[in-house]
Swiss-Prot record:
GO terms for molecular function: ATP binding; ATP hydrolysis activity; ATP-dependent DNA damage sensor activity; mismatched DNA binding. This is DNA mismatch repair protein MutL. It comes from the Bacteria. Residues 358-397 are annotated as: Disordered. GO terms for cellular component: mismatch repair complex. Residues 371-382 have a biased composition (Low complexity).
Amino acid sequence: MSDRRPIATLPDLLISQIAAGEVIERPASVLKEILENAIDAGARAIEVRLEGGGIRRIAVTDDGSGIPPEELPLALTRHATSKIRSLDELESVASMGFRGEALASIASVADLTIISRTRGAEHAWQIDGGSLQVSPASGPPGTTIDVRQLFDRVPARRKFLRSEATEFGHCVDAMERIALAHPEVAFRLFHHDRAQRQWLPADHGQRIRDVLGAEFVGHVLPVLAAAGAIALMGMVTRPTAARARADRQYLYVNGRFVRDRTVSHALRSAYADVLHGDRQPAYVLYLDIDPGAVDVNVHPAKHEVRFRDSGAVHRFVSQVVGQTLAQTGGAEAVPAGVPDGAAPDTAYAGEPAAAAPGLAEPRAPYPAAYPSPGQSPYQGSPARPHTQVPFRLHGEPAGIPATDWQSLYRPLPGDAAPAATALRAAPATPLPTADEHPLGQALAQLHGIYILAQNSRGLVLVDMHAAHERVVYEQLKRALDDRALPRQDLLVPVVFHAAEKDVALVEEHETQLNELGFEMRPSGPASIAVRSVPALLARGDIESLARAVLRDLGAVGVSRLLTEQRNELLSTMACHGSVRANRRLTLEEMNALLRQMEITERADQCNHGRPTWVQWSVNDLDKLFLRGQ
């Protein structure tokens, strides 16, 4: 057994190096801390120069308030800060930094120099992180922090760094996060003296476009809502623009970039009905909340926060984003990703306007360019009709068989000539205006799967099963919420063979099945009789529907099935109760489905996240036939 070592106080340098291990992981961590200090100093222009991906050098120059020469040594002292003075100030801190550890930690693992000049001072002053000697220097008002040879003093940490290109990429990511939070600040980034990024002061909408690109903004919906002391604004992507990776998710709480499980779960809940598979939403969201209601002193790098009332935050974010996604529809779908001034291209269900919607925020210093609550976020978007047209499937229409196409070209009988002349003389039916029917009027059915329709923009193609599935799903949700799910008694019960465990489920959960609109009873030791079903699903495949419900019931149990799994069950029911492929519809039925799509929330995607319709403009069709080329 080795000799016991006495307890001793650690030297300040080692303490700072230990603290640096929590905060300074890589060059991007250094850059983040320095940029946050510049923002806290009131900078309006920040220049960043990197060498070796930030490993060899990180120099940040700002035009902020500067540091007086007598305070420069304190700036490199641990737990010295101008941000807070008491616990009360800590609990309501609004600045980016507040611990007073960043510069001391950086100086312990790298060569650090600060040159700073306050406004009105005759010249700047310089301090070296090693000697802590303050000397006169030249420089404009503001502060320059120069960090060289990161982790040279801690070789064990340096070997964990990646290539220069990788570290440079992380530095760009860190700078983008800060730039998105502070659009009023101008940023310039140089790498090996070559300009890499430049963002001029702008509003939030323009800054998002500058940083993330026009393609990102071309697929977003604006978000703006406030309730009491909490407000949310920003942009969320439409479900059709979801990504395979969660790499475009930016959440800011009081201007601070964070990763929060509460808000992330709320966003996933809002997208639950419209995301396909494992796709990830993209968003830039700014959550504004009373600083006293959120604890930012949770994570060493301040990446996490703790809300005093996380449940209220979850409900607010989920409802706001859910309502935003629900308000999308055919009337608001226009081409995405179109260069400025170019003609529109094909627009998929739910794609946005070519011009990015402006952003505004609920309170100062946010700009006021956002639409008011309840107003359409897209200028010129047609109003939606509020009359519901019931969609009911009738008998097969009496159409001309495909094998008898020759009859279309037979000569008209003599008594039909006047009628034909009158038909040719009659004016063409005017196109439906966008205000009347955003999805237009049905023209025909294609292969028993798609509906072709004509609207004021051009041609609309609808997946009739996917569209009807969404319509039925939303109707089921509303009916179950209102405890008014109508039942349809079957004239002849549907009896099918079932496993003993399914028969037992029917006996055990008869009451819960009744709540869902089903009346099922055992008709033998291995058979079940279905006597009633939800009226919305009465025309579906009753046996398949009953088996699907029992399968879900056995998999998750009745308590979860009627709470968190409720929507999954209703989605299954809607899928089995929707019009199937190869079912021939009349024009009246097709138009009824289009009208219901226009008044149904989230009608742009089916319950599984796939698009329900696509739009081709007349210009798109002209291009196909080289018209005007």
